[in-house]
From Swiss-Prot:
Domain PCI: 193-361
Pfam family, one: RPN7
Electron transport is among the record's keywords: no
Membrane-spanning segments: none
GO cellular component entries: proteasome accessory complex
Protein name per UniProt: 26S proteasome non-ATPase regulatory subunit 6
Coiled-coil residue spans: none
Functional summary from the UniProt entry: Component of the 26S proteasome, a multiprotein complex involved in the ATP-dependent degradation of ubiquitinated proteins. This complex plays a key role in the maintenance of protein homeostasis by removing misfolded or damaged proteins, which could impair cellular functions, and by removing proteins whose functions are no longer required. Therefore, the proteasome participates in numerous cellular processes, including cell cycle progression, apoptosis, or DNA damage repair.
Domain of life assignment: Eukaryota
Subunit structure: Component of the 19S proteasome regulatory particle complex. The 26S proteasome consists of a 20S core particle (CP) and two 19S regulatory subunits (RP). The regulatory particle is made of a lid composed of 9 subunits including PSMD6, a base containing 6 ATPases and few additional components.
Family indicated by similarity: Belongs to the proteasome subunit S10 family.
C-alpha cells in the first residue's frame, strides 16, 4: 500500500484541486456563509497571490471584492512575472535549449499557480513545443489535465487524455502509465462513468502515487464508492472485500468500511443508514455532487435486487423490517422501480406479498443447452450420412 510518506512522489499540487473543492462547498446554500471554509480558501488565495483566480471567485460567488488585497496580489504577480521573463530572456541569450525550456516551464507553472487559466495554457503549450524528452512532455500534459479537472473543462481533459495515451504508447514509463489511469478514473467519476472509473482505480490501488490529485484515503473511498455500484457481487468480493490494500486503509475509514460490508453481508438496515451518510458526503463532494441522486437510487435498487434474489416471495413487512423502514415506504419504492422495469417482481396488494418473477437463469441455461444440443445432433447426423455415402 502507498504510505503517506510517499506523498513526495506525487507531482506538484498545481493547480491544487483542494481549492476547487472549497470553491464548490461555498457555492452550496448550506455552506455559503461558512466562515471556516471561506478562510481556508482565502488563505490559499493569499498564499499564492492568486489575483486572476480571486477576481473570478468574487464574480462567481457574488462576493464583495477586497480591492486592497487584489491590488497587492496583482503587484506581486507583476513583479514575479517580470523576474521570470528576465530569466527566460537571459536563458535565450546566454544558455542552452534545456535552460530555455526550464525558464519557460517556470513561467507556465507560476501562471497556473495564480489561477491565470488561459495564460497558463498558452505558456504550457509553448513549453511543450520546446520539449524533446518524452517524460517531460507527459508531465506537461499532466499539468493540462489538472487544469482541466480544476476548471472541469471537458474538452481540455478529453484532448489531453488522448495525447497522454499516445505519448505513453511511444514509450511512457510504468509510473506515468499508472498515473494516467488515476486521472482518467477521476474524470470518469465526474462524467458518471462509474464502471470505467472502478476498473481504472482498481488497477492502480497498489501503485497509487497521484498525491497531486488527492490523498490515499480519498482515493480508496472513491474506489469503494464506484466499485459498489459498478461491480457484480463476485467481483466486488475478489477485488474489494478481499483487497489487502483497500482493507488496510478501511481500518481508518470506519464509515466507508461499514457501507461496503453492510451490503455485502446483507445487513440491509445498516446499509440504508450508511447510504444516507454517503449521500450527505456526496452532496459536498465536487465530483460526486451532480450524481448523488442517481447513485443513491441505483444503490437502493441494487440492495432490493440482492434481497429479492434469495426468495421466490416474501412479505412487505419482512422487507420493511430488513431495511429498517416503514411498509408504506417499501411499497412505494418497489412500485416505482417495478413500473420503471428496474425490479423483476410484483406486489400482491391484498396479501402484502412481493413475488419475484425474474427470468430464471438456470432454466434459461437449460433451454439454451437443449437448443445447442439439438443443433449439434443434427450436424452429427448430417456428417454421418455424408461419411456413409
Amino acid at each position: 500500500m502507498p504510505l503517506e510518506n510517499l506523498e513526495e512522489e506525487g507531482l506538484p499540487k498545481n493547480p491544487d484541486l483542494r481549492i476547487a473543492q472549497l470553491r464548490f462547498l461555498l457555492s452550496l446554500p448550506e455552506h455559503r456563509g461558512d466562515a471556516a471554509v471561506r478562510e481556508e480558501l482565502m488563505a490559499a488565495v493569499r498564499e499564492n497571490n492568486m489575483a486572476p483566480y480571486y477576481e473570478a471567485l468574487c464574480k462567481s460567488l457574488d462576493w464583495q471584492m477586497d480591492v486592497d488585497l487584489l491590488s497587492k496580489m496583482k503587484k506581486a504577480n507583476e513583479e514575479e512575472l517580470k523576474r521570470l521573463d528576465e530569466e527566460l530572456e537571459d536563458a535565450e541569450k546566454n544558455l542552452g535549449e534545456s535552460e530555455i525550456r526550464d525558464a519557460m516551464m517556470a513561467k507556465a507553472e507560476y501562471l497556473c499557480q495564480i489561477g491565470d487559466k488561459e495564460g497558463a495554457l498558452t505558456a504550457f503549450r509553448k513549453t511543450y513545443d520546446k520539449t524533446v524528452a518524452l517524460g517531460h512532455r507527459l508531465d506537461i500534459v499532466f499539468y493540462l489535465l489538472r487544469i482541466g479537472l480544476f476548471y472541469m473543462d471537458n474538452d481540455l481533459i478529453t484532448r489531453n487524455t488522448e495525447k497522454a495515451k499516445s505519448l505513453i504508447e511511444e514509450g511512457g514509463d510504468w509510473d506515468r502509465r499508472n498515473r494516467l489511469k488515476v486521472y482518467q478514473g477521476l474524470y470518469c467519476v465526474a462524467i458518471r462513468d462509474f464502471k470505467q472509473a472502478a476498473e481504472l482505480f482498481l488497477d492502480t490501488v497498489s501503485t497509487f502515487t497521484s498525491y497531486e490529485l488527492m490523498d490515499y484515503k480519498t482515493f480508496v473511498t472513491y474506489t469503494v464508492y464506484v466499485s459498489m455500484i459498478a461491480l457484480e457481487r463476485p467481483d466486488l468480493r475478489e477485488k474489494v472485500i478481499k483487497g489487502a490494500e483497500i482493507l488496510e486503509v478501511l481500518h481508518s475509514l470506519p464509515a466507508v468500511r461499514q457501507y461496503l460490508f453492510s451490503l455485502y453481508e446483507c445487513r440491509y438496515s445498516v446499509f440504508f443508514q450508511s447510504l444516507a451518510i454517503v449521500e450527505q458526503e456526496m452532496k459536498k463532494d465536487w465530483l460526486f455532487a451532480p450524481h448523488y441522486r442517481y447513485y443513491v437510487r441505483e444503490m437502493r435498487i441494487h440492495a432490493y435486487s440482492q434481497l429479492l434474489e434469495s426468495y421466490r416471495s416474501l412479505t412487505l413487512g419482512y422487507m420493511a423490517e430488513a431495511f429498517g423502514v416503514g411498509v408504506d415506504f417499501i411499497d412505494q419504492e418497489l412500485s416505482r422501480f417495478i413500473a420503471a422495469g428496474r425490479l423483476h417482481c410484483k406486489i400482491d396488494k391484498v396479501n402484502e406479498i412481493v413475488e419475484t418473477n425474474r427470468p430464471d437463469s438456470k432454466n434459461w441455461q437449460y433451454q439454451e443447452t437443449i437448443k445447442k444440443g439439438d443443433l449439434l445432433l443434427n450436424r452429427v447426423q448430417k456428417l454421418s450420412r455424408v461419411i456413409n455415402m
